[in-house]
Amino acid sequence: MSMDSYKIGLGNLDTKTRRNAESNNVSFWNEEAKKLSWFKPWTETLVWNSPFAKWFIGGEINASYNTLDVHQANIAKKPAILWEGEDGTSRTITYADLYTDVCKFANVLKSLGIKKGDRVTIYLPMVPELPITMLACARIGAIHTVVFSGFSAASLRDRIDDSKSKVIVTADVGYRRGSSIDLKGIIDESISGLNFVEHVVVLKRAEGNLQLGPKDSLWHELMNGSSDKCEPEHLESTHPLFILYTSGTTGKPKGVLHGTGGYLTHLNSTFQWAFDIKDSDIFFCTADIGWVTGHSYVVYGPLLHGATEIMYEGVPDYPDISRIWDIIDRYGVTIFYTTPTALRM
């Protein structure tokens, strides 16, 4: 076997591919970007002004289009998300379902005054409405900023204040180790006095009455009256897709901004190389979407490739240490991406 045909465990990334990348990385990424669907081609691949890079100048693209619209003709009925809650409840969301819900919530955001460039903070547990909100933002050119649902009101407030988000999307509760977490109460505390926050959209999950304030609206009520038709915005390649904040362990959290075209190109290619994804695969990444691994390997990466992914709300050892392995067995997971800590349990 020649070295040029030898696979190193990274899918299609063979020696020849690596040599091409090393010899002229700008030309290499120029070719990789062509694997995505662009509304308008770019005129310049890279403008580098250290430490800032601008990729695919002049090109126009949309992340929601590349994860949803491109699949509707061929795999609309294929499961996109297989969701399981900690209590064992489950949902199956096809690519057609996801497309419809994303379009509807994109129109909800428009009705709340959100336009291209506005920021939307998402403080949701690991439920399908989280990627739906992310993709709805991407569809209309809003910039999503997801905050891990385990963060305190003070940590959440820092991030909302820095991003100046006009709309917050949250839930009344999340579930962890059999207990409910009052997410809405944390939101109310975090936005007290932040007058630039105009609306809070609340996904109601728990039984009983939910006390709503003047800025609050219920997810299901807004969705019921929303159109399922929403054309994707044609966005410049450098248009921000999302802001994700660092953990803040070494100082004030820093918002890291990811541009659309560069992020999608890199992720689309590296996801294929790392996982060698096939149409029949069931992909399961245990990362929380509140972190960049979750953005890339629970949301954008699998959906770019038309994969079926597992999404789990809960901890890996509840009600016992076999939980993750039970999920793998039940859904026939073929690719499993997790941490060494989880494997050592």
Per-range role (PLM):
Residues L264-I282, V292-T334:
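Conserved AMP-binding/adenylation subdomain of ANL enzymes
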Residues P125, V167-I186, E207, Y312-D317, ...:
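Adenylate-forming
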Residues D87-G88, V167-S237:
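ANL superfamily adenylate-forming
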Residues G141:
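Structured binding elements
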Residues L124, T145-D161, V173-Y175, S179-D182, ...:
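ATP-dependent adenylate-forming carboxylate-activation enzymes
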Residues S64, I81-L135, S152-R157, P214-N224, ...:
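Conserved AMP-binding/adenylate-forming core of the ANL superfamily
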Residues K77-P79, V201-V202, G213-Y245, K252, ...:
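Conserved pre-ATP/AMP-binding loop-to-beta segment of ANL
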